[in-house]
Amino acid sequence: EWCEVKVYQPWSAPLLHINLSESQIKDLLQITDTISKDTNRVSYNDKLAGEIENEWEIPTSNDMTPQTLKFHSFKNYIDGLVWKYLKTLASQYHIENDEIPEPLVIFKNNIENIKIISAWFNDQKDDEYNPAHDHTGVLSGVLYLKIPEYLPSRKHHNADGSIVFISNECKTDGIMTNSTLLLSPEVGDLFLFSSSLKHQVYPFRTADEKGIRRSLS
């Protein structure tokens, strides 16, 4: 019989992955569709690294519009995810009596007052991409609302349209550790991660070159 096994890994922040419900996806599609059709929508191109034409701001103000109300409702869900993230992060430390380790105290104290600094969505088309980059702030997230059918990759590994997370740690051995994680997202996937974690998005191809992949960050 095994004794209790504990695992510690305080030298890296985790990547949280969860699937949204159909109702959440529907609400977020309604928000982004409305913005897409708004002639007064605000471009986010000059604030982002992506080689993507259609990048639009999602207002995070307290204006009582149907879109902002729905988005604020979704923010309550994000608040809960951040708590899950903190618990996972704390579990990587050596913890006695459920005490939060000192490096995370400030994080914990601010969780009840989470502020979304900025929000936007991308409508990515054929051959558009996001180069390796990171974000400001403490935590970042990306979720997927639309994904077209891609043409088969020209190579055997089928990485077209993938998102790649890149470790900030320079030294990896390729056996027990790896410097990158490549994921092929599906509709409803949400990833939450440290804003300092670099990531990039590969381009894709569709049969009619009119496919749109919508992601929200």
PLM segments and residue spans:
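Sparse recognition of residues in long alpha-helices and their boundaries
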Residues: 94, 203-204
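Short amphipathic alpha-helical "recognition" segments used for binding
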Residues: 79, 206-207
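Non-heme Fe(II)/2-oxoglutarate
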Residues: 1-108, 127-130
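Catalytic core of non-heme Fe(II) oxygenases with the double-stranded beta-helix
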Residues: 113-192, 200-202, 208-212, 216
